[in-house]
A protein has these predicted regions:
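A short, N-terminal "cap"/entry segment at the start of jelly-roll beta-barrel domains
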Residues: 1-42, 46-47, 75-77, 96-105, ...
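Short beta-strand His + acidic residue motifs that chelate non-heme Fe in jelly-roll/DSBH
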Residues: 67-70, 85, 92-100, 168
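Short acidic-glycine-tyrosine-enriched beta hairpin
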Residues: 71-86
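Short N-terminal edge-element motif at the start of the domain
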Residues: 55-59, 65-68, 73
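Histidine-centered divalent metal-coordination motifs
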Residues: 49-51, 93
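Short beta-strand segments in beta-sandwich/barrel cores
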Residues: 39, 63-67, 82-83, 116, ...
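Single conserved hydrophobic/aromatic residue that forms the stacking wall/gate
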Residues: 161-165, 169-170
Length: 170
């Protein structure tokens, strides 16, 4: 089972223990600490809040995700983009739905870092496929520079490029 909370402006599903959801059997999986599926109402979001020693990946599925932080980054990302924030020694950031009339749906993933107390870092990446091939996996995050994005952990993230319609009913 997953945790679920409805705060009016935020509907969120938690794969692991998070906020008011606690399941001692679901605190983390290896280095994966958080896998949240969030839906944020238009114009709403998370005010400035701190993180330390965590790799935070945000993946918009629908809508416009506005990010701002204490190391002078400010931008809006959309589906096909990802943002990677290495909190290191500490960073303060906010995330908001930049639309006035459309829901924002995004995944937020937290990964424990390989090395703690590094310099905070933020970057966004366009991970839209550069191929027209269907049903392929695309490497979007890797620790060794072999993907558009990297994090401070031995972790690889793959994205399904495109699922074609089945040619026959199942």
């Amino acid at each position: 089972s997953r945790g679920y909370a409805n705060h009016g402006w935020l509907k969120t599903h938690h794969t692991f223990s998070f906020a008011n959801y606690y399941n001692p059997e679901r605190v983390h999986f290896g280095m994966l600490r958080v896998l949240n599926d969030d839906s944020v109402a238009p114009g709403e979001g998370f005010d400035m809040h701190p993180h330390k020693n965590m790799e935070v990946i945000s993946i918009p599925l629908k809508g416009y995700l506005r990010h701002g932080d204490s190391i002078k980054n400010s931008e809006v990302i959309t589906p096909g983009d990802i943002q990677v924030m290495s909190a290191g020694t500490g960073i303060v950031h906010s995330e908001f739905n930049d639309s006035g009339n459309e829901q924002l749906e995004f995944l937020q993933i937290w990964v424990f870092p390989r090395e703690e107390n590094t310099k905070p870092h933020y970057a966004s990446y366009d991970v839209r496929p550069v191929t027209s091939e269907k049903n392929k996996l695309s490497l979007i995050i890797a620790p060794d520079g072999s993907a558009p994005a990297s994090i401070n952990q031995d972790a690889w993230f793959l994205s399904l490029i495109h699922i074609s319609e089945p040619t026959r009913p199942y």
